[in-house]
Design a protein with these regions (language model features):
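Residue position within the beta-strands of beta-propeller blades
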Residues: 72-75, 118-121, 170-173, 214-218, ...
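Blade-level signature of beta-propeller repeat domains, shared across WD40, Kelch, NHL, RCC1
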Residues: 340-378
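Repeated scaffold domains used in trafficking and secretory/extracellular systems
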Residues: 57-69, 104-114, 154-166, 199-210, ...
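A short beta-strand motif characteristic of beta-propeller blades
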Residues: 47-58, 95-101, 144-152, 191-198, ...
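Short loop/turn segments that connect beta-strands within beta-propeller blades
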Residues: 90-94, 138-143, 185-190, 230-234, ...
Length: 378
């Protein structure tokens, strides 16, 4: 018994001495923290491969594009006869069909829903000569045309927008330099309804969301204010009034974020970016993003990513616009398309980006030439 006890004590002594001589485990260092929101994130390359549907080079590229999982619909100009052409491309087969436009082209008046695309236009009545506003529906596969509605047009609608869902065709009409009317054509009662009127020196933008259609209005009738308005019930769901020296110029939003760009009236290039968390209502400090984006570029959101462009210097000293995205609240920035971006548009529904890239070889008549490229956002 004593012998067994001695052996146990000896074993414990050995273990104790070993423990005393053992070096303490090196603690695992914490991962490098993300930069604070007021520090500029480093721009890293995360280039997206391009899918070119359709592979068409346009001179004076027109409106659109509109696209979904099955089709891409675009508008381009045929310089040989000064005609405007619709292009409808089947994304599964790559087949492209085209048809010449009837009526007057109105900027941004093209919308795609299901297997049909809709076009808002103005043309003269063949019998009376009076101007009429028409909403036309085209089958994407056959390009068969149907007139949805026709009504007298006593105003000039140089710019418009069009949003389509199961119940409504919603569009914006320009009544004067600062007066706009948002109307909705109900597919149920087959009538047009005035949804709201507003005064603004900046054209209001329609935003199609999963829960309905919204208007982004940047108004100045009673001082500069940026508003997000739900058209179904004419409710202002968010509003921000700017200082008298600041002008709101771009506004993007989704379920999580609101991003507003303001410009200085004294210096349009001295813009600032403001970001709000929609869940908490808190405005974030994003001073580090100042100067990262091209001042007049569009803003789009997909999830927590903000898409815009920035100026990049070429080897010869010239500059081009490259497409970038910033992870909100401003902790990461990625260069995702390094071409010379003329315009771009993001579709949150499909998570894709349409880019108009300035074409390398100018056309013979020296008009601006662009190529449409469709990119995956993820």
């Amino acid at each position: 018994m004593k012998k067994t006890l001695c052996l146990l004590l000896a074993a414990l002594l050995v273990l104790s001495l070993a423990a005393c001589g053992k070096q303490p485990a090196t603690p695992t260092p914490d991962p490098t923290p993300d930069p604070a929101p007021n520090e500029a994130p480093k721009l890293v390359e995360a280039l997206i491969p391009a899918e070119e549907y359709p592979d068409i080079v346009w001179e004076n590229a027109g409106g659109g594009p509109c696209w979904n999982e099955n089709y891409i619909v675009t508008v381009g100009n045929d310089s040989s006869n000064s005609k405007t052409i619709f292009y409808s491309t089947n994304r599964q087969t790559g087949e492209t069909r085209s048809t010449e436009l009837d009526g007057l082209w109105i900027s941004d008046s093209l919308a795609l829903y299901g297997d049909s695309f809709y076009w808002l236009t103005i043309e003269a009545n063949k019998e009376t000569g009076e101007r009429e506003l028409l909403l036309l529906k085209y089958d994407c596969a056959t390009l068969e045309k149907t007139t949805v509605f026709t009504e007298p047009c006593e105003y000039w609608a140089e710019n418009s927008q069009l949003a389509i869902d199961d119940e409504w065709a919603i569009y914006v009409l320009t009544l004067s330099d600062s007066e706009y009317e948002i109307r909705g054509y109900s597919f149920a009662d087959e009538k047009n309804h005035t949804l709201m009127k507003l005064e603004s020196s900046i054209f209001p933008r329609l935003v199609q969301m999963t829960d309905g259609c919204y208007s982004v209005a940047l108004q100045e009738s009673d001082g500069w204010a940026a508003r997000i308005i739900r058209l179904a019930d004419d409710e202002t769901v968010w509003e921000n009034r700017s200082e008298s020296t600041r002008v709101p110029t771009r506004l993007a939003f989704n379920e999580s974020w609101i991003v507003l760009r303001e410009e200085s009236q004294a210096d349009p290039n001295a813009g600032s970016l403001r970001v709000w968390n929609r869940t908490t209502g808190e405005e974030l400090n994003v001073d580090g993003l100042k100067g990262m984006l091209y001042p007049s570029s569009e803003l789009y959101l997909i999830g927590d990513w903000l898409y815009s462009t920035r100026l990049v210097t070429n080897e010869d000293g010239s500059q081009r616009q490259a497409l970038i995205r910033i992870h909100l609240p401003g902790d990461q920035a990625e260069l995702i398309y390094d071409g010379d971006v003329f315009r771009f548009r993001v579709d949150p529904m499909t998570g894709e980006i349409a880019v108009w890239q300035t074409y390398d070889e100018p056309s013979q008549n020296h008009s601006t030439t662009h190529k449409l490229i469709l990119l995956k956002a993820s």
